[in-house]
């Protein structure tokens, strides 16, 4: 009798466990990974104004380091990459509402982390000045820049503007709407300095002879570049991180970076 009762109890416990597992699986939300594969497209939000990571050309196409990498990620999933143009002030809202990933030289910040996951960082960066080459010695430090006579220029809505407002309260600050042509303002003598990511200053000094990056190897602060991912979706995050790990380990990422920076 005892054996029969124990057997029945064991059967009931097993059945309950199976039912609980089935219910748990049914209740588990689908990962964005599955949605992307089912949809057949990977939607990437990007500003298109930040060389060498993302640039929106006159023909309506995007190019840059992050664009090539997003194409690679999409290929690994067997889908097509679809790029959604946004702006730095609207990046987070557009990403949450419209996209699977957010790319294009995005700096990791705790404020952004509140609304999204980040991938593993793929580049260490930091804020440093770019100025006319004759002025390199004049703008070496935050204190030298933060003077009423200094004309600082920044693009709106991102970490550059936040940095400038925090560290240059005494300087004359101009928020210039076009992050592509903003460097021409310095060349033309309409501004003295822009503080942006060191990687961008290195490229822009090549594109704009007469401009020089100031100590890009010793930026004012520590920064990293990573991609935005949907908050809470660890399955998708793990896939993208593994893809990124392999892209770096195999040299694919380095080859793409060299294509745009060398």
Show which residues each predicted segment covers.
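Periplasmic-binding protein-like
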Residues: 124-131, 198, 202-245, 262
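Ligand-binding cleft/hinge of the Venus flytrap
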Residues: 54-58, 70-79, 141-146, 160-177, ...
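Flexible hinge/capping segments at coil-to-helix
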Residues: 133-150
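Extracytoplasmic small-molecule ligand-binding "clamshell" domains
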Residues: 22-106, 114
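Short helix-initiation/N-cap motifs at beta->coil->alpha
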Residues: 67, 82-93, 137-139, 174-188, ...
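A ligand-binding cleft/hinge motif common to bilobed small-molecule-binding domains
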Residues: 89-93, 106-115, 163-166, 187-221
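Ligand-binding clefts/hinges and TM-proximal coupling segments of bilobed small-molecule sensing domains
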Residues: 21-27, 159-176, 213-217, 244-262
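Hydrophobic residues within well-ordered alpha-helices
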Residues: 73, 94-96, 145, 186-187, ...
